[in-house]
């Protein structure tokens, strides 16, 4: 079956390891091996994977994901949904957490993140990034072109990432 744009995007957002982890959790509930799980089990699977949707969120998710109203979702639909939850969660991460993040990456505590520090951040996320990508992100994020990222620029950059 061909993937929708959303599904392709969801796959691109996740690392291979995450997809494998999600698949393992998904398969535990795919009792008959038919490649889909009951929407009833969705909450349980999501909680296993560290998500914590409320009943309302869950209903909204199911309504959105189970487009054909079959009462089941397949793995691709599941990925789309997990990515959406993760992005929501990330958005909900307060500035306070980002401030902590900033302090951790601002190794020399000068109130700025320089290109070295930025490279470390990106590599720490497990993303495979080239020097060129790091330079591009630095250029994009460093609005006042002083060669460093201050906290406000960092916040904007993180919004962009999510």
Curated annotation (Swiss-Prot):
The record lists Ca(2+) 2 as bound by: 66, 68, 70, 72, 77
Q: Where does Ca(2+) 4 bind?
A: 142, 144, 146, 148, 153
Domain EF-hand, which positions? Answer: 17-52, 53-88, 93-128, 129-162
- Matching Gene3D superfamilies: EF-hand
Report keywords, A-Z: Calcium, Metal-binding, Muscle protein, Repeat
Entry keyword tRNA-binding? no
> Which Pfam family is one of this chain's hits?
EF-hand_7
Q: Binding positions for Ca(2+) 3? A: 106, 108, 110, 117
Highest taxon of source: Eukaryota
What cystine pairs are annotated? none
Q: Select a single GO molecular function from the record's annotations and give it.
A: calcium ion binding
Q: Which GO terms describe its cellular component?
A: myosin II complex
Where Ca(2+) 1 binds, per the record, is at 30, 32, 36, 41
Q: So what does this one do?
A: Troponin is the central regulatory protein of striated muscle contraction. Tn consists of three components: Tn-I which is the inhibitor of actomyosin ATPase, Tn-T which contains the binding site for tropomyosin and Tn-C. The binding of calcium to Tn-C abolishes the inhibitory action of Tn on actin filaments.
The remark listed among the other comments is:
Skeletal muscle troponin C binds four calcium ions.
The record's PANTHER family line, in alphabetical order, gives: MYOSIN LIGHT CHAIN 1, 3, TROPONIN C2, FAST SKELETAL TYPE
Family stated for the protein in its record: Belongs to the troponin C family.
- Name the UniProt record assigns to this protein: Troponin C, skeletal muscle
Which species is this record about? Meleagris gallopavo (Wild turkey)
Give the lineage: Eukaryota, Metazoa, Chordata, Craniata, Vertebrata
């Amino acid at each position: 079956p061909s993937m929708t744009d959303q599904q392709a995007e969801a796959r691109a957002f996740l690392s291979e390891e995450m997809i494998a982890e999600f698949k393992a959790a998904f398969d535990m509930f795919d009792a008959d091996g038919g490649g889909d799980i009951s929407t009833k089990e969705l909450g349980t699977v999501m909680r296993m994977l560290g998500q914590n949707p409320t009943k309302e969120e869950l209903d909204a998710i199911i309504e959105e994901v189970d487009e054909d109203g079959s009462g089941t979702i397949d793995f691709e639909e599941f990925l789309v949904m997990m990515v959406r939850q993760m992005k929501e969660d990330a958005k909900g991460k307060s500035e306070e957490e980002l401030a902590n993040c900033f302090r951790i990456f601002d190794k020399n505590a000068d109130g700025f993140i320089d290109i070295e520090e930025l490279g470390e951040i990106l590599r720490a996320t497990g993303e495979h990034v080239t020097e060129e990508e790091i330079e591009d992100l630095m250029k994009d994020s460093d609005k006042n072109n002083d060669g460093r990222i201050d906290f406000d620029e960092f916040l904007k950059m993180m919004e962009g990432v999510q």
